Amino acid sequence: VAWTKYMAEKKPWRLALLASRVFGVDSYNYNETERAYILSEKLSAFFKKLHLPTTLAELKIDNKDFDAMAARAVRNGNVGHYVPLDATAIKDILTLAL
């Protein structure tokens, strides 16, 4: 869910397409960025319906190790193909996940 929030500002078009195709979000009433954020809300609601945690706080994970986690994630270079993520971006996503 946090990743979709982060990507909503970076490259919303694919998320917007997913929101329209999977959740029926109307492309005439919402722009791409709005639909990307709606996708995040819809995914969160779906996961909650399945009784799955949607935040790190629900898993009792705080931000004290975010720097180490981000550094470990990119120790072999940036991750991701849609939008390459460096340590700063990963830390931002982890922060959104709180």
Language model features with spans:
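Gly/Pro-rich interdomain helix-loop hinge
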Residues: A2-D65
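Short, amphipathic C-terminal "tail helix"
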Residues: D62-L98
